[in-house]
């Protein structure tokens, strides 16, 4: 197992303290049924949640920022059901938002599937990508499965190196 520790604070407090700022959380979205606030199965909630986050990103960095200076972290564990539903959601929303080739990273290829800190694994990896411009490839694949939706996604085992200032989201 693993542990992730992230300190979140108000913008003014961070500036007053002279804290190094790695990113910001402009909003949080969830759309799930039941008592456990996670997505229990494929459905419209997945699309709604991700579309809201993408719309927020677009409102902050503009259409070009979202279309040309963003990437996405896949969360699905590589199981047939997850790879199909997750790739379908990402691909369809990339198309909807006018993204032609959205780079996809999946940190689980390097860390495995941690339980509680899985979101923290992805958060810290994303912060590193924004700082250094290095989008990790998915090292555990040598080709895409036939059932992966990828007409608007760039999914591969090769790392993508970009200048750090070329990534907004």
Question: Locations of the language-model features?
Answer:
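Short helix-capping and hinge/turn segments at secondary-structure transitions, especially at repeat
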Residues: 55-59, 74, 78, 95, ...
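Stable alpha-helical structural segments in soluble proteins, enriched in small hydrophobic residues
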Residues: 49-62, 89, 93, 122, ...
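Condensing-enzyme catalytic core mediating Claisen C-C bond formation in acyl metabolism
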Residues: 1-65, 70-71
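A general structural signal for well-ordered alpha-helical packing
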Residues: 22, 47-51, 69, 86-91, ...
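Beta-strand segments within the central parallel beta-sheet cores of soluble alpha/beta enzyme folds
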Residues: 20-28, 63-74, 101-109, 137-147, ...
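Conserved beta-strand-centric core segments of catalytic alpha/beta enzyme folds
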Residues: 1-13, 116-169
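Short glycine/threonine-rich loop-to-helix capping motif typified by GTGT followed
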Residues: 34-46, 76-93, 114-122, 154
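Conserved catalytic cysteine-centered active-site region
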Residues: 1, 90-121
């Amino acid at each position: 197992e693993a542990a992730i520790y992230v300190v979140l604070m108000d913008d003014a407090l961070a500036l007053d303290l002279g804290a190094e700022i790695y990113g910001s959380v402009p909003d949080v979205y969830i759309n799930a049924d039941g008592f456990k606030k996670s997505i229990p199965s494929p459905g419209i909630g997945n699309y709604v949640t991700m579309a809201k986050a993408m719309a927020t990103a677009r409102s902050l960095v503009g259409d070009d920022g979202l279309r040309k200076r963003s990437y996405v972290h896949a969360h699905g564990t590589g199981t047939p059901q997850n790879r199909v539903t997750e790739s379908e959601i990402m691909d369809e929303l990339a198309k909807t938002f006018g993204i032609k080739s959205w780079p996809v990273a999946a940190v689980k290829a390097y860390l495995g599937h941690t339980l509680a800190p899985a979101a923290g694994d992805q958060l810290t990896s994303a912060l590193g990508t924004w700082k250094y411009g290095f989008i990790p490839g998915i090292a555990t694949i040598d080709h895409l499965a036939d059932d992966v939706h990828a007409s608007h996604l760039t999914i591969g085992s090769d790392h993508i190196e970009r200048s750090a200032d070329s990534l907004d989201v």
